[in-house]
Every structure is written in structure tokens, then in C-alpha cells.
């Protein structure tokens, strides 16, 4: 909590650096403690978007509590566009708010 899932057809050369930067960025953006941030990065995928196989990215953010998607969509898109060198019009972001009783860690749910 939160979970950031990054899927892209671009091959990432500096995976560990991207994971570290993304962890700090998402923690700050969502105002959540970084020690609870989990990131899943899947690169080099076969992806097709807007009629082409050009570089694209799907960002999925799941978090307990309210997500102000209107306010954070732009900075998230800008961050990943810059880090992955993918135009913002080739990035989808999916937000999902999760009830605290549906997310568990260390033998118990958060709610």
C-alpha cells in the first residue's frame, strides 16, 4: 500500500534506479510512507497502443484511501514520460482505491 505497477514495451537499462526514483516519487505524490510502497516493473513487453507498436506504458496505482486522480495525473504522467522517454500521449494511468480491510501486510489487514 500503495502498489505501483509499471508495464512497458520499452527495455529499461537502469531498473534499480527507476525503482528507487519511482518509490520516492509515488510516496511523495500520494503522501504515503515509502516503507509501504511496492513497485512491480515489467519491461520489454509486447504492447500495441493507438494502432502502433511504438513505445508505450501502462501505469497502475492501487492505494488504500482516497486518490485525487485529477490532481496527480499530470505529475505522474510527466514523471514517467521523462524517466522512460515515452510521450505522454502513449501513457495510460489506472487508479484504484482499495478498502483497508482488503489489503493485508504482516499477518493482518490494514483496516
What do the PLM-derived regions correspond to, one by one?
Residues 1-111:
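Interaction-mediating elements
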